[in-house]
């Protein structure tokens, strides 16, 4: 269980919380903020509780974030991205009270949560503002190239994956290019570590390899 759960946003009677796992002895100034996976449609912040506890046992504060998801809140990808940004900004605004160093926040996530994390560091908001303070990215089988979701769905994939692909396509509202971190690679991005399986059928390893190579070409550390 987390040491503390605090509401960072209330939308349409939905309480979105940040779940804090505090180390008994803080050995690092860093804080790790994580977003769960689930195709922007399902999943739960609870799924990261064990990872967060393991991280906190190493002396680092770890936070698992709620955000709105399609099958529970009837939302789209843009809403999930807005929540991720709101969660980060809330931590920054309350850093002093939370005893968090705002200059040492690492952001991470798995699958769709990896897209949310990378988006925070890479994609500008509606006012063309970019978050430049993020210390690093920790990405687990991340959805870094969402442009590929706009392809025609192959006939030979299993029904369950086909249905999920159709659902995700609807959630993007056509913004496959705009919401794809791979389209925002530039110099000066945070150092990143990416964990990805070579046999991943949902996100082929080639996508991750291209992203990594493109990042390195721009002088970023991956």
Tell me what each language-model feature is.
Residues 1-222:
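Alpha/beta-hydrolase superfamily serine-hydrolase fold, recognizing
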């Amino acid at each position: 269980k987390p040491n503390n759960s605090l509401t960072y946003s209330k939308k349409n009677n939905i309480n979105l919380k940040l779940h804090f796992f505090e180390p008994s002895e803080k050995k690092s100034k860093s804080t790790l903020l994580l977003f769960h996976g689930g195709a922007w449609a399902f999943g739960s912040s609870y799924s990261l509780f064990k990872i967060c506890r393991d991280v906190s046992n190493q002396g680092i504060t770890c936070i698992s974030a709620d955000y709105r998801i399609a099958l529970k809140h009837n939302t789209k990808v843009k809403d999930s991205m807005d929540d991720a940004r709101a969660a980060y900004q809330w931590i920054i605004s309350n850093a002093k009270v939370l005893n968090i160093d705002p200059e040492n926040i690492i952001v991470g996530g798995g699958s769709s949560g990896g897209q949310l994390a990378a988006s925070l560091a890479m994609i500008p908001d509606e006012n063309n503002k970019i978050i430049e303070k993020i210390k690093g990215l920790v990405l687990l089988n991340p959805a870094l190239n969402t442009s590929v979701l706009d392809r025609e769905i192959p006939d030979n994939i299993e029904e369950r994956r086909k249905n999920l692909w159709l659902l995700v396509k609807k959630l993007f509202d056509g913004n496959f290019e705009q919401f794809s971190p791979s389209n925002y690679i530039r110099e000066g991005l945070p150092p990143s570590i990416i964990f990805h399986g070579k046999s991943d059928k949902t996100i082929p390893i080639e996508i991750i390899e291209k992203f990594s190579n493109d990042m390195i070409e721009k002088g970023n550390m991956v």
